[in-house]
Amino acid sequence: MLDRLSALEDRYEKLNDLLADPAIIKDTNQLREVSKEQSQLAPTVEVYRVYRDKMEAYQEARHMLTDPEMRDLAKEEVAVLEPEIKDLETKLKALLLPKDPNDDKNVIVEIRGAAGGDEAALFAGDLFKMYSKFAEKQNWKIEIIDASYTELGGYKEIIFIVKGSGAYSKLKYENGAHRVQRVPSTESGGRIHTSTATVAVLPEAEDVEVEIHDKDVRVDTFTSSGPGGQSVNTTQSAVRVTHVPTGIVASCQDEKSQIKNKEKAMKVLRARVYDKIQREQQAEYDEKRKSAVGTGDRSERIRTYNFAQNRVTDHRIGLTIQKLDRILQGEMDEVIDTLVMEYQARASEAAN
């Protein structure tokens, strides 16, 4: 591991030199590629340098244990450094794991009210607000593609793009069924109801990753509608696109322009086709390797939001946090960071 880390540090220094090279600076494409590789290596190199410094201090402290005058002080330093070094080794092993090629991509998120009728649709709206506030804290941008409203202001379905560095790496663990336990605003008897909403997170696919031929796409136009099904546009600006070979459908009615709606719908269609290809490839890989590592099936109930107890429980990793109010305000870091570390640990264990 140390030889590999040393080689990565050498490569990192070489990339820094290239970023100062006038020839690289003039070439926009090359500059972008070098900058991207340098930024990807930076976290690993930074942790490695801290680890190396700690190891040097640890070796020095161990050496001082033979000195009667310094023994007590050295023991204290060794006791402090040992857990720090162990923690850094765990981080380095995780950083050296193969990266998910989709981690730096923008994502398309689809939220749908499931079991629970109007209450499920309202909860879908709460999830959308939670992700919107989390995205704002990450300096990401959100762009709504399509939404189907209920009369009470919830969402039967809402589809949106999250644009920003590392969006997929943090949001990919949100795939699945989210359960809410609370007293609905429409409940006069004060009884707690259980409802669910489903979340799908797809990496945005580029044209070069998924080739969709015009002849394979059927385009239909229709009049866009707003809350309660009311028409909000008398022209047929809403667009529905169908990928005929797979039967995958996407639609958009958020823009007034039919052209813009088609562009957005095609983004969703491309992401869904890309996701289908990836899931088929993963299923084939899992069958061959009997892999148990994954981000959880979408049909799983992955998380429960209990309003009465101000509690959020992630069932995949047994995590319970009594901060529901803050999590719904977008303070999701504790949940997401714990998920990332857990799945990295599982991947590291599977790799060894």
Curated annotation (Swiss-Prot):
Molecular-function GO terms, alphabetical: translation release factor activity, codon specific
Record's keyword annotation contains Cytoplasm: yes
A GO cellular-component term linked to this record: cytoplasm
Keyword line: Cytoplasm, Methylation, Protein biosynthesis
Cellular localization per UniProt: Cytoplasm
SMART domains: PCRF
Residues carrying N5-methylglutamine: 230
Post-translational modification: Methylated by PrmC. Methylation increases the termination efficiency of RF1.
Pfam family, one: RF-1
Purpose of the protein: Peptide chain release factor 1 directs the termination of translation in response to the peptide chain termination codons UAG and UAA.
Similarity field: Belongs to the prokaryotic/mitochondrial release factor family.
PANTHER family listed in its UniProt record: LD18447P
Full protein name: Peptide chain release factor 1
Species assigned in the record: Exiguobacterium sibiricum (strain DSM 17290 / CCUG 55495 / CIP 109462 / JCM 13490 / 255-15)
Organism taxonomic ancestry: Bacteria, Bacillati, Bacillota, Bacilli, Bacillales
